[in-house]
Each structure stands twice: as structure tokens, then as C-alpha cells.
Amino acid sequence: MSAANELEEGRALRLDWDKLAKLGARGQRVVPVVLQHADSGDVLFVGYANDEALRETLARRQAVLWSTSRDELWHKGATSGDWLDLVEVRVNCEQNSLLYRVRPRTGGVCHTRGPDGRARARCYYRRVVSERELEFA
């Protein structure tokens, strides 16, 4: 299994404790964004937004994020067709993170695929069972 595939499909816990430090070191001015299904309350995934991504999200009424790996705007669904229509945006008490309450147009949300070959409905598809081990939820 490739390293990327092992990270996304494996059963070993390999948290990236340095993610936020790397963003800061590269001068990326972003805040975390929790994307939540507006009807079920399920957390779909966590992304990042800068001021431009938030502006585009509000204007388009669809989830737009900042891709920290590609250093560019990421209009969720533009490539995959898995659009996330915006219901509302909330900000936390310290104004250092956002909550996008969204409705997926299709069943798919995550860029990973389940055993059936379809995009997963959320990115939280494994649970932590120990300090080193995961299992599929």
C-alpha cells in the first residue's frame, strides 16, 4: 500500500501534529473550518479558509476553502461534482474558527472512496481504538 493510501485507508494512527506549525511557517493566514451537514449534524470534514475563501463562500452560497497543500482556492465540487450548498456560516466565541453548515448535493463528500468505489459521505470514517490503531466505523 502506498504511503498516501496507507494514511487514508490504513489502520495505523499517524496524526500530523505539525500541520498548523507548517501553515504558520509558510505565512498562510487561515482559520479552521468545520463543515457540518445542516440536517443530520454530522461533521463532514475540516478545512481551512482565508479571507478570499470566506468571501467566495458567502457570494456563491457554496463551500469554498483554501487548499493548504496547493495554495489556491478550492471550490468544493468544482472537480468532483460533490457540491456543498451553504445554509449558514457561524463563527466561534474567539473568532478563530468557522462552521459551515452545508447540504451536500450528492451523497459524496470526502475525496476518498469507500469499498463500493463511491466518494464517502464524510471524512471521519475510522475511529481511534488505541494510541496506534484505527478501525473502520
Regions found by a protein language model. Name each.
Residues S2-V30, H37-L44, A49-A137:
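C-terminal binding/interaction regions
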